[in-house]
Design a protein with these regions (language model features):
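Thiamine diphosphate
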Residues: 1, 9-14, 53-54, 62, ...
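Active-site diphosphate/adenylate-binding microenvironment
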Residues: 93-179
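Glycine-rich, acidic loop regions that bind phosphate or pyrophosphate groups
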Residues: 2-89
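Generic beta-strand/beta-sheet core signal
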Residues: 20-22, 46, 132-136, 157, ...
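Beta-sheet entry/capping signal
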Residues: 16-18, 42-43, 128-131, 181-183
Length: 190
């Protein structure tokens, strides 16, 4: 969708099945469904909330995410996607990362772009540093540029337009994880 990477959006065009796990499938993430062009496209939604599992003509799986995926894996048995599809995904992801590397590279312009500023911070961040963002155009930039170096090190809020969340959110994260650095990106909406 609008906040996603080109690689995921490109793959979505030809995919025949997507499994949405614990997501509300908002327009931000789906591109208002314009990305799914395959006429045979099917959707499975794994969600603990019945309302969110029953969206977009999906096959709902009303379940805890982990338990639901364990059951789906069990039902799939030894089935695997074909190698051509996996290679297409890898190549697309590689191209996406090359694109991001170009966007964050220094240039001779007077002021750095959002991507360049975020990239500079990212380059110097430790693997345990936590990035937080929430409002304005900066959210999309951070989402695309920041590639978490370890689990649970990226926090964003954009689905409910809670301008200023990143400030309170960062304080709460720092209280919960005092030994980790918290990096806050304040957007133009805060």
């Amino acid at each position: 969708g609008g906040l996603g990477g080109r690689s995921a959006n490109d793959i979505a065009k030809t995919t025949d099945l997507a499994i949405a796990i614990g997501t509300k499938l908002s327009d931000f993430t789906t591109g208002s469904w314009s990305n799914f062009e395959n006429p045979n496209f099917r959707l499975i939604c794994v969600n603990a909330a019945r309302f969110d599992a029953n969206k977009h003509l999906a096959q709902p799986v009303i379940s805890d995410a982990k338990l639901g995926m364990e059951k789906i894996s069990e039902l799939l048995g030894n089935w695997k996607s074909n190698n051509a599809w996996i290679e297409l995904a890898r190549e697309s992801y590689k191209k996406w990362n090359e694109y991001i590397d170009q966007q964050i590279a220094p240039t001779n312009q007077e002021l750095p772009s959002y991507a360049q500023a975020i990239g500079a911070v990212y380059k110097h961040a430790d693997p345990t540093d936590i990035a937080v963002t929430a409002a304005g155009g900066l959210v999309g930039e951070v989402l695309q540029v920041w590639r978490p170096k370890s689990l649970n090190t990226y926090e964003t809020e954009w689905g409910f337009s809670c301008m200023g969340y990143e400030i309170a959110g960062a304080l709460g994260i720092k209280m919960a994880k005092p030994d980790q650095e918290v990096i806050v990106f304040c957007g133009d909406g805060s």
